[in-house]
Every structure is written in structure tokens, then in C-alpha cells.
Amino acid sequence: MLSDLNPSFDGISKISDYNFDKFELKVLGIARLLFESNEYPIAQTWKSAFLKAEQNFSSPFGASIAHIISISIDFMSNGRTSNFNYFKENNNSSLTLITDEERYFLMALKSIRNNNISKANSYAVMLCEGPQINKFLLAMEGIAIITGDIEKKAAGFNGAVDGARTRDPRRDRPVL
């Protein structure tokens, strides 16, 4: 977590320098609350994340989107060895600044939504700090499926997201 820093700080840039759409910025706000919830569980900011998702996205999609963002964060965190830098959602700088890690997170989502699998893989490797990216990408794919940006069986991915489970294509049912 970062306090009020300026954009000249290494690893921090202006959100306006990137072409994030409104949906992606809403995802960032929800993700920031979930990042904080992982760092400070007693704060229970996950409740605020789900509430914000319900307010930003029509029912029943809000809770589903928050849930999949939470799953993607869990999968991302599994391989990371260094700290994850983020801005708290209620921080004054959160409206204008973004950390490299937050940017990689959003760029992975943007790349999946644009069906640019190679770019999504690159951002996922930087974010997850290694090659264990498949579950993270499947979770991010789930966000794009909910929004209708991609079909359930997107080229380049080995499955679709159903919660945290993948589908067995031979049986077309969830693998537990």
C-alpha cells in the first residue's frame, strides 16, 4: 500500500496516461478495496468492494464481477514473492495515480477484452512474477465473459471460468 505519492515516484504513473475505459476504472476501484482487504482483513473492505460492484454494475452482474476480481487477485497473489503496491480506494491520489502492479492488472484485463492473448500473457507474467499465470488469466477471462467482450471459448485460452473452476471440454462440466 502506498500513501500520498507523486507520479515522479518510481512505479507510479498518472491514470490519464493510459486509455482505460470507464468499466476498467470501475474494476480498479473494486480491486483496490479487495487489495486492501487482503492486506488488512480486519478492515473488511471486501464488503465495500461488493457493495461498490453492485452499485456500478446491473444486477446480478455486480456480485459476480466482484467475486471474479477477488478470485483473480487470489490467483495472482499465489506466485508473487514481492509486495503488491496499490493505492487505497479512499486515498486522494487514487483518482489520478496508478501503481505499476495495478496497471499490469488492468492491462491484462484490457488485453483479454481485446482478445490480445499474447499481451495478456506478458502482463500476467509481470503481475504474477512468474509463469504460473493460467488460473489468473482464466479468472480475468471470466470478467470479459460476464461483460460479453469475449465468448466462453476464446482463442488462446484453455477453458472458461465458472467461479474458480475450469471446464473439462470432454464432459462440458466443471472440474472440481
Regions found by a protein language model. Name each.
Residues M1-L106, K110-G159, R165, R170-L176:
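Polar/charged low-complexity regulatory segments
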